[in-house]
Amino acid sequence: MSNEEQAQKDDAQPVNEAAIDATAEQADAEVEELSAEQARILELEAALAASEATLAAQKDSVMRAIADADNVRKRAEGEVDKARKFALEKFASELLPVADNLERALQVADKENEAIKPVIEGVDITLKSFVSSIEKFGMKVIDPQGETFNPEQHQAMSMQENAELPANTVMAVMQKGYELNGRLLRPAMVMVSRAPEGGVDTQA
């Protein structure tokens, strides 16, 4: 190799080293930039996860609050309904003696006496109007004449042997019973038949 060629080679070597150094520095910068971006991504992902966890907790709290409010509302409605039913039952119970007195007046009145027939008719109309009015509010008369004795609605005041009726048949109603919205307000007071001693129960 001539001296001139050697000189050219020596002059080119610093240029190549400088280019390599520049490339290395650029690569390092890109790596640092990439690392910073990755760190930022991880930071954002962590923040997102924290936000989602907070949102889930808040959503759970809101749902619990809604459920609690709904339970409070239902309890309040139940208490109001109970209070209303209790007040209505008490009021209805106070009305029963009125119906009883009107019925007794009709039972003891002398229907053959022409002088009091208008009074009897007036009492009868009043009783029917009264019963019609209370039925509009959910009250129902229990008049089990001739029906099978039902201990859930009837109260047996006495029993009497009767060969013509099946045992446990309501022979007479001393006092009518009443229901209010399907609940027993007062049982009917009744006389119940029973099979004669030594006889055959016609229900068997």
From Swiss-Prot:
GO annotation terms (biological process): protein folding
Task: Work out whether the entry's keyword set contains Transmembrane.
Answer: no
Q: Which CDD domains match?
A: GrpE
Q: Low complexity bias: where? A: 17-26
Q: Which PROSITE patterns match?
A: GRPE (PS01071)
Q: What are the recorded GO MF terms, alphabetically?
A: adenyl-nucleotide exchange factor activity; protein homodimerization activity; protein-folding chaperone binding; unfolded protein binding
Subcellular localization is given as:
Cytoplasm
Q: Which UniProt keywords apply?
A: Chaperone, Cytoplasm, Stress response
Region of interest called Disordered, as start-end residue ranges on this chain:
1-32
> What GO cellular-component annotations does this UniProt entry give?
cytosol
What is known about what this protein does? Participates actively in the response to hyperosmotic and heat shock by preventing the aggregation of stress-denatured proteins, in association with DnaK and GrpE. It is the nucleotide exchange factor for DnaK and may function as a thermosensor. Unfolded proteins bind initially to DnaJ; upon interaction with the DnaJ-bound protein, DnaK hydrolyzes its bound ATP, resulting in the formation of a stable complex. GrpE releases ADP from DnaK; ATP binding to DnaK triggers the release of the substrate protein, thus completing the reaction cycle.
What is said about its interaction partners and assembly? Homodimer.
Check the record and name the NCBIfam families matching this protein. Answer: PRK14139.1, PRK14140.1, PRK14150.1
Descriptive protein name: Protein GrpE
The encoding gene: grpE
